[in-house]
Amino acid sequence: MADNIDLELSLQTNHSMIINKRLTQSDVDYNNRLHLPKREFEQFILPEMEWELVMNLRNSVEVIVKDVNGNEYHVTLVKYQNGHYYFMGKWMDIVRAKGYKRDDEISLLWDKSNEVFYII
């Protein structure tokens, strides 16, 4: 219960660190990756991330994604050579756990103080 309250407060005060995404077929199928909206990611999320984390994105970094129920997932965040950003690795664990399908809408909140993404 406390996690939900904290998340709601974060959403109200940190709305500039939220990106929205309508899932495509490739986000939920065997490709095992979520394509993150580049413009929004670079505008809202990257400036809030630690410099060292941003510098390592080409090599890929492990980040934590939490849902509103407190479940925690470790995914790989990577920047491809084409400049696009993806969640990879355990992304499909989230898809299966949440039952996501094409055209579902999700929001990602970057919690700068804890260096964690929240998926809502």
UniProtKB/Swiss-Prot annotation:
PROSITE patterns: B3. Pfam families: B3. Keywords: DNA-binding, Nucleus, Transcription, Transcription regulation. InterPro entries: B3_DNA-bd, B3_domain, DNA-bd_pseudobarrel_sf. SUPFAM superfamilies: DNA-binding pseudobarrel domain. It comes from the Eukaryota. One of its GO terms (cellular component) is nucleus. One of its GO terms (molecular function) is DNA binding. Its main location: nucleus. It is found in: Nucleus. Residues 19-120 bind DNA. This is Putative B3 domain-containing protein At3g28853. It comes from Arabidopsis thaliana (Mouse-ear cress). The lineage of its organism: Eukaryota, Viridiplantae, Streptophyta, Embryophyta, Tracheophyta.
